[in-house]
A protein has these predicted regions:
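A short, surface-exposed loop/turn module that caps and links secondary-structure elements
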Residues: 51, 55-83
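A short small-residue
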Residues: 29-35, 66
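A short, highly charged nucleic-acid-interacting micro-segment common to nuclease
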Residues: 35-48
Length: 152
């Protein structure tokens, strides 16, 4: 199991798919431009996500800055989100008793933050929760998560 700062990290497919895409895009960028790849948008996003997943969130998942209030509606206030710049959101839940964090979904370049838009990540994630993918129920969420995002 992957552990950081004493927390076990689990990944739902909604985040694993995006992480794999970004990792591959970052790898291609490095191959295509070994000296200038660090300025590539995919490389920057992958590094920012990696930092959030392994450092910022596990250092204190209860931090106020991760609360999303009623943006997803009152039924989903227990979901948290970490911001990457102004347009990307990483959604997760945690359980302080079992010390588990489940990363559920991160939006992509087709679903950038834009309040009121149908493709806004909050609107899309709320619909996804309503359809049960990812599950809102903690036990179901854990059952549908994996410990290594690199595995298919």
């Amino acid at each position: 199991l992957t552990q950081y700062h004493g927390w076990t990290l689990l990944f739902h497919e909604g985040v694993t798919v995006q992480l794999r895409k970004l990792q591959e895009a970052a790898r291609r960028a490095e191959q295509n431009d070994p000296h200038g790849f660090e300025s590539n948008a995919n490389v920057k996003l992958f590094r920012a996500l990696s930092h959030l997943i392994m450092e910022a969130v596990p250092s204190d998942p209860a931090r106020d800055e991760f609360r999303q209030g009623n943006t997803l509606g009152t039924a989903y206030r227990h979901w948290r989100r970490a911001k990457i710049g102004r347009r990307f959101r990483l959604f997760f839940r945690y359980d302080s008793k079992s010390k588990v964090i489940v990363y559920a979904w991160v939006n992509d370049e087709n679903t950038l933050r834009s309040a009121g838009s149908k493709s806004d990540p909050y609107a899309l994630f709320e619909k996804m929760l309503g359809r049960g993918n990812p599950p809102d129920d903690w036990d179901a969420l854990i059952a549908n998560a994996r410990s290594d995002w690199r595995e298919s």
